[in-house]
């Protein structure tokens, strides 16, 4: 019915040049802390005993949302154990470490072309003066891989349209090489893909 009342064309129909997506999935084994937490999370899902997760017992209202709570913990745990609690330490095989190594690999591979990279994560977004996954990966890129700090930026740093435009222009000019952001802030309306070589999705 829709085709009877509309005239539509696909990108292929009108010859729009679009890059071919080359999707790569990385299988990262859990760290020892993650393995232990997964077992606790499974027991919590069965029993509702929140003390297994290092938190207070569930309220009556929370009891009804037990599986939502478990899902939220699972998302945080899979990204970084420090999203669950500050008692956990960094680990060389966590997702932040693997992501930093991967970003550095493409940074060096496309250095002559000033290739740029987007890093998407809706969890652990940038918060000044507070531990977050964005800043942790940036720290690893600078300290472990020697990438200049000024070439790594967060879309959340832009507080107005001019600052946002400056970030986008910096990416297109190759002055900024890595840009972090959430889906809502970096997913649409950001025409910074002129030199883009890789898009990383963490969650």
Residue ranges, per PLM feature:
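Residue-level preference for the first positions of well-ordered beta-strands
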Residues: 25, 116-118, 177-178
């Amino acid at each position: 019915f829709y085709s009877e009342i509309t005239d539509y064309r696909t990108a292929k129909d009108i010859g729009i040049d679009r890059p071919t997506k080359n999707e790569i999935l990385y299988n990262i084994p859990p760290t020892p802390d993650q393995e232990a937490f997964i077992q606790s999370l499974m027991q919590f899902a069965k029993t509702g005993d929140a003390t297994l997760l290092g938190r207070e017992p569930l309220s009556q209202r929370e009891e009804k949302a037990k599986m939502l709570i478990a899902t939220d913990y699972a998302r945080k745990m899979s990204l970084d154990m420090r999203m669950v609690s500050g008692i956990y330490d960094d680990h060389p095989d966590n997702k932040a470490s693997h992501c930093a190594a991967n970003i550095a690999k493409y940074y060096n591979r496309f250095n002559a072309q000033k290739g740029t990279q987007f890093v998407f994560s809706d969890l652990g977004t940038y918060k000044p003066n507070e531990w977050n996954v964005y800043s942790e990966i940036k720290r690893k890129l600078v300290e472990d891989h020697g990438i200049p700090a000024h070439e790594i930026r967060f879309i959340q740093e832009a507080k107005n349209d001019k600052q946002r435009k400056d970030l986008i222009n910096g990416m297109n000019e190759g002055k900024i090489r890595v840009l972090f952001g959430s889906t809502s802030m970096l997913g649409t309306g950001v025409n910074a893909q002129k030199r883009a070589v890789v898009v990383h999705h963490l969650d």
